[in-house]
């Protein structure tokens, strides 16, 4: 099953994406849907107003998650290009809801920086309250997977040892277009092994990142277990699992996003983001 949040004339709506149409579930957005314990059954049975798939205006998948937890230095090739060793524990930081944009919305390049970089990421969306679970128990916490680009403002990020200021600029983080439930992604495979899918970033059609989600140092299940030691994960929370090698900042010379560039982020079987970069005017 695939779920999305779309913009309509009467506000945002959660929808189930069928092969030929989008069907309203009766909720304002996917986050609101997930807060109901019976969300899966309700979404599967939904028979609300419908929309053609062509031309859907995708809002951020979960517009106002309680938590957006990101993971740094979590792909082996990215760690190598940074000249580091794999960390013994996940490197965690946060984003806030104002950073999020829809799957085809414009990425806002901050007026104060010329060093804005791309980071393709697999994101996990939580589907039930989760605290103190093991990695073996973690799959039950997952509502689904989606695509995120952790667009990063490198000069601000590197001003201090804390990355937050380079990760929290408004309207920089596309997420979506859909939440894909595990049963669809793992059909015929063993979900215990985690998701293996090609992940890529293109800028103006040039492939700049290409890897596989099986290259994660800490996979989704391990991350959920670790984070749940620290804080309760609630329905709609987003975990961005990290980016592979090929970021612009690590290139020689460095490359960054510019006004008018088209940023395409793709994970096989999960979805595609396509965002035009626009320079902020102040």
Language model regions located:
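A generic local secondary-structure boundary/capping motif
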Residues: 4, 58-60, 81-83, 107-116, ...
